[in-house]
């Protein structure tokens, strides 16, 4: 049985510029709590602006996104109902991340484990996406159920 829950994160920092030591530099990857979002853009979970003095820009964006966690053996089936990315583990393994659309809402998907995703969405879309995910969990296409 899977769980859909909102995750409280300590902070989120957007870092722009040259890669910092230990940052991922390949598309669709994450290193720990550092998500690669583009050629010169990362999202650091739990970081602080002052931790990146050599970055072109480091901005606290903690209020910019709400984070959901979706976990369960059929998590890919739930997400496939509203996302066109191939989320099979051979293509999107643990540590993978991507900016995409989920049910027409712009999100960041981060696969943290084989059966667990974090979904980052703008606060204005949070009620819509929460309702969509709850509906998707009860879909006949999924054996997942929310608690």
Task: Name what the model sees in each region.
Residues 1-147:
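Basic, glycine/lysine-rich polyanion-binding surfaces/domains
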């Amino acid at each position: 049985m899977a769980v859909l829950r909102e995750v409280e994160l300590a902070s989120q920092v957007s870092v722009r510029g040259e890669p910092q030591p230990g940052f991922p530099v390949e598309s669709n990857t994450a290193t720990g709590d550092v998500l690669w979002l583009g050629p010169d853009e990362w999202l650091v979970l739990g970081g602080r602006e002052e931790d990146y003095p050599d970055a072109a820009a480091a901005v606290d964006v903690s209020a910019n996104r709400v984070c959901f966690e979706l976990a369960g053996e059929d998590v890919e089936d739930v997400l496939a109902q509203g996302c066109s990315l191939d989320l099979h583990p051979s293509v999107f393994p643990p540590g993978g991340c991507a900016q995409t659309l989920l049910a027409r809402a712009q999100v960041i998907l981060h696969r943290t484990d084989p059966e667990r995703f974090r979904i980052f969405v703008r606060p204005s879309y949070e009620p819509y996406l929460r309702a969509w995910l709850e509906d998707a969990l009860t879909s006949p296409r999924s054996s997942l159920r929310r608690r």
